[in-house]
Amino acid sequence: HEIHDQPVVVEAKEHQEDKIKQIKIPEKGRPVNEVVSEMMNEVYRYRGDANHPRFFSFVPGPASSVSWLGDIMTSAYNIHAGGSKLAPMVNCIEQEVLKWLAKQVGFTENPGGVFVSGGSMANITALTAARDNTLTDINLHLGTAYISDQTHSSVAKGLRIIGITDSRIRRIPTNS
């Protein structure tokens, strides 16, 4: 079937969710092909298809065949790119791509930066850098963030994670 002919979202019925909720912790393992089949038929088919041409909503980053292959390779090799000693070539590629991106936007030749898993982690990383550049352990409790009422929810969550409490987050109303 063509993707255009498929629904954008396939919703699960309550009885299908109830079936999952009734599953008990198994006492022994099951054959992999049985588990994969169950996942394909009873879990993965009920979803919003971000690759669908009529999908216009939350943007989780739809998978392409190339990104899928990249995920498989990354999982298979379990590379931790947290430092040049653990994965020197992956770390080198990351640094070179950061240089390419920096050059495209007119930044310095030796930028700092890291790749992260998505927008929420990017927000936490940026908020942490801003906090650490501005506050010390002594005055952390004074840190206050100003965000608009249109700011993505991951920013307020990130602020809480890095120690800026709700009472120190100021939401500014927007009018246009």
Question: What are these model-predicted stretches?
Answer:
Residues H1-N110:
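N-terminal entrance/gating region of PLP-dependent enzymes' catalytic architecture
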Residues R30, R45-R47, R54, R131, ...:
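Arginine residue identity/basic-tract feature
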Residues Y77-K85, F107-V114, L140-L142, S167-P173:
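Glycine- and acidic
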Residues P88, T134-T136, D166-S167:
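Alpha-helix boundary/interfacial micro-motifs
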Residues E94, L98-K99, N110-N139, V155-L159:
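Conserved beta-loop-alpha segment that forms the PLP phosphate-binding cup at the N-terminus of a helix
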Residues S117-S120, N139-S176:
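PLP-dependent aminotransferase-class I/II
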